[in-house]
């Protein structure tokens, strides 16, 4: 097991991301957010886009999981947008990420053989770079492990793809996590819809080797929205 992966076992990763339509968009804000996460005891960080990764790496000294989102005009349920190509992977690796994360789902637009070719190409070009497989189903987890080019399996996309959206859970997908732990030997990162301490307790009891938390920490408008919506329900507004 890679030493960087070992550092994250039994740990908490905080995802620091902001989009152009939000006030916190910008590398300086993400670096500040990452510093706050490290101050709070985070074991690792997840950052998006080369410029943000460079800023976060300069501000913090804990492992950074790098992704490179490339959005298209189609339905997000059908699009591969988390580090979808070798070129997008190269950009964040050269920006200094410690672990590369990419979409390892199987789609109509990209069958497994194409994904396998991408993973082999990345491993050949960057043999020392640990790879996290962001996926949505048990089948994808098993196939990703079988390639021998993946170091961590992550439930990042559970509920966010066409073939998993119908079974999307309100909180983290505990059943998927349990199934992956039974079927695979690689470390499993629980990620997606972990909002409360109760959610964290559930994924830990289900066997998660590490946990990544994003919106519940780093997206203030969504955090606010949850409280506001609950308040509205209380007053039937």
Spell out what each predicted region is.
Residues 41, 60-64, 94-99, 125-128, ...:
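Glycine-enriched alpha-helix->loop->beta-strand junction motifs that scaffold or abut catalytic
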Residues 65-68, 133, 189-192:
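Short beta-strand elements of ligand-binding domains
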